[in-house]
Amino acid sequence: MTRIRRGYIARRRRTKIRLFASTFRGSHSRLTRTTTQQKIRALVSAHRDRGKQKRYFRRLWITRINAVIRDNRVFYSYSRLIHDLYKKQLLLNRKILAQIAISNRNCLYMISNEIIK
């Protein structure tokens, strides 16, 4: 059986993979088989961690809101605040509430006082 020379197609494919893996360390950026495996692994990790990132940020927002809410001036818990927000139909998500809690605490206190009434 004669050997088939692949031509520019295989070279183009390998070049594309090498460009993707150019910032990897050691043989992970030089050897073709290793770069292919590392590319697959990198994309799997990126896909998995996009889901994790959403979870981590939600946890961070909840922690920030809870820390400000449990301050001395408002005798409220996070779960009661969210429950009352839904009852009053105030559509503020956790991200916005966390930004308000950090930048302008008085505004969050005003919101919670309006809910209590």
Curated annotation (Swiss-Prot):
Listed GO MF terms: rRNA binding; structural constituent of ribosome
Q: Which domain of life is it from?
A: Eukaryota
State if Translocase is listed as a keyword: no
Principal place where this protein is found?
Answer: plastid
Q: Does the keyword Signal apply?
A: no
Single GO cellular component term = ribonucleoprotein complex
The subcellular localization recorded is: Plastid, Chloroplast
**One GO BP annotation of this record:** ribosomal large subunit assembly
Which SUPFAM superfamilies has this protein been placed in? Ribosomal protein L20
Q: Which UniProt keywords apply?
A: Chloroplast, Plastid, Ribonucleoprotein, Ribosomal protein, RNA-binding, rRNA-binding
Q: What family does the entry list?
A: Belongs to the bacterial ribosomal protein bL20 family.
What does the function comment of this entry state?
A: Binds directly to 23S ribosomal RNA and is necessary for the in vitro assembly process of the 50S ribosomal subunit. It is not involved in the protein synthesizing functions of that subunit.
The record ties this protein, via HAMAP family, to: Ribosomal_bL20 (MF_00382)
NCBIfam families given for it? rplT_bact
**Name this polypeptide is given:** Large ribosomal subunit protein bL20c
What is the gene name?
rpl20
